[in-house]
A protein has these predicted regions:
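Substrate-binding clefts and catalytic carboxylate motifs of secreted carbohydrate-active enzymes
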Residues: 1-109
Length: 109
């Protein structure tokens, strides 16, 4: 789906920045989407970094007081800096050509 959207938008001959791409519960994943965005030379913005007050770990339309989701929507880190999913951190680092010490965090709750 994204590929077709990118093809259509390329016709504008303008720089592209994708701001709404990461939504784990809808099938968007760092390991699948970052390489595509990189290959297409499309910038991307990721909403949510640390699980906290903005509650971007919750999916759109979440009901206040509902149980915590098994799968986070956006965020990638717990408040203490531990990765939500160390494999995702490795995928992000691979896309960026960097490495960190974050990949050895706790497992998903």
């Amino acid at each position: 789906v994204l590929q077709r959207i990118f093809e259509r938008l390329r016709k504008t001959e303008r720089p592209l920045l994708c701001t709404e791409w990461m939504a784990r519960t809808l099938g968007s994943r760092f390991e699948t989407h970052l390489p595509l965005l990189q290959a297409e030379r499309i910038g991307s913005w990721h909403w949510g970094l640390v699980r906290g007050r903005t509650q971007t770990h919750l999916p759109w339309g979440s009901i206040e007081g509902a149980p915590e989701p098994g799968t986070w929507f956006h965020d990638i880190l717990y408040a203490d800096g531990t990765p939500y999913d160390p494999a995702e951190i490795a995928s992000i680092e691979a896309s960026l050509g960097t490495s960190s010490r974050m990949g050895n965090g706790r497992s998903k709750e």
